[in-house]
Regions:
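Short glycine/proline- and aromatic-enriched beta-strand/turn motifs that initiate or cap beta-hairpins
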Residues: 10-81, 228, 234
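Residues that define the transmembrane beta-barrel architecture of outer-membrane proteins
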Residues: 15-17, 54-58, 65, 96-102, ...
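Residues on the lipid-exposed face of transmembrane beta-strands in outer-membrane beta-barrel proteins
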Residues: 21, 60-66, 104-108, 118-120, ...
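Transmembrane beta-barrel strands of outer-membrane/channel proteins
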Residues: 21-27, 73-77, 118-122, 167-171, ...
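Flexible, solvent-exposed loop segments that connect beta-strands
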Residues: 32-49, 81-97, 125-143, 210-220
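Predominantly the C-terminal beta-signal and adjacent terminal strand-loop region
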Residues: 34, 183-235
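Repeated loop/turn-to-beta-strand initiation elements of outer-membrane beta-barrel proteins
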Residues: 68-71, 113-116, 161-165, 194-198
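Transmembrane beta-strand segments that form the barrel wall of outer-membrane beta-barrel proteins
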Residues: 164-179
Length: 235
C-alpha cells in the first residue's frame, strides 16, 4: 500500500524529503483463465469457496516524497492456488501460481489530495496446471516474466481524527509486456504516532499476458484480490 499513502506535513518545508518503510501481508484469491500448451484451466472462485482459495502474499516497500514528488519501490510475493472437481469426482482441475512483482513508481502531486502516477512493473510468474479426467492426469508447468508500464491516479483524503482514506488505480500493459494490466488499492490508515501507522485495505492485481506458440504457448488472464493489513514507519 506504499505508493498510495502520502502524509500531510503542513509544518515542514514543502521541498523537504521524507522517507517511509512499509511491510504488509494479504490473503489473495485468484480467478480467471490460465492455459499452457493445449491445457486450459478456468478458475472461478465463488463466495462459498473464496477462503479455500486464499493463500498468502507479502510486500515490503520504500517511499521517499516531498510535497510535489514521490518515488516508491516495492516488492510483492504471492503464492496462490485453486482446485475444483465434479460432484462425482470423475474430473478435477487445479492451478498454482507463485509470483514476484517488483514495481517502481514516480508520483507528481496535482492537488493536495490527488497524485498522478507512472510505474514500471516487473512480473516473474511460475504456473502449474493440473487436469484429471477419470484416471488420466495431465500436469504442465511454465515460467514467464515481463515488464509493464502503468499510469494511474492516487486519491487521499482525511476522514476525521487520525484516519485517512486512500483509493489508487493504475492501468497499463498496452501490448508492451502484457496486453492489459490493472491494479487497484483501497485503504483505511490510522496514524498512531508521528512515525508509526497501520493499515487495513483491499487490493486487486489483474493481467492478461500471452506468449509463445504450440507446446510453449502461455496465456494468463488472471485476477488476484484480497484483504490486507500493514504497518508503516516514517523517518
Amino acid at each position: 500500500f506504499a505508493a498510495c499513502s502520502p502524509l500531510a506535513h503542513a509544518q515542514q518545508d514543502p521541498g523537504e524529503w521524507r522517507q517511509r518503510v512499509f511491510v504488509y501481508g494479504m490473503g489473495a484469491a485468484i480467478e480467471g483463465d490460465a492455459q499452457i500448451g493445449n491445457v486450459k484451466v478456468p478458475v472461478d472462485v465463488s463466495i462459498s469457496d473464496l477462503f479455500d482459495a486464499l493463500k498468502f502474499g507479502a510486500m515490503a516497500a520504500y517511499r521517499v516524497e516531498n510535497d510535489v514528488w514521490s518515488f516508491t519501490g516495492d516488492v510483492t510475493y504471492m503464492n496462490l492456488g485453486w482446485s475444483a472437481q465434479t460432484q462425482q469426482g470423475r474430473a478435477s482441475s487445479g492451478l498454482d501460481v507463485e509470483q514476484i512483482t517488483v514495481m517502481g513508481t514516480a508520483g507528481r502531486r496535482l492537488t493536495p489530495h490527488l497524485e498522478a502516477l507512472f510505474s514500471l512493473a516487473y512480473f516473474d510468474l511460475s504456473a502449474d496446471l493440473q487436469v484429471r479426467v477419470l484416471q488420466q492426469r495431465t500436469e504442465v508447468s511454465r515460467d514467464a516474466s515481463w515488464v509493464d508500464p502503468l499510469v494511474g491516479l492516487n486519491y487521499v483524503v482525511p476522514i476525521g481524527g487520525k484516519w485517512t482514506y486512500t483509493l489508487r488505480g493504475d492501468v497499463g500493459g498496452f501490448g508492451i509486456g502484457s496486453d492489459l494490466t490493472w491494479h487497484m488499492i483501497t485503504t483505511f490508515r490510522r496514524q498512531n504516532t508521528q512515525r508509526f501507522a497501520w493499515y487495513l485495505g483491499y487490493r486487486v492485481i489483474a493481467y492478461d499476458y500471452e506468449d509463445g506458440s504450440g507446446r510453449n504457448y502461455q496465456h494468463y488472464d488472471l485476477r488476484q484480490h484480497g484483504p490486507g493489513a500493514g504497518i508503516a514507519f516514517s523517518f
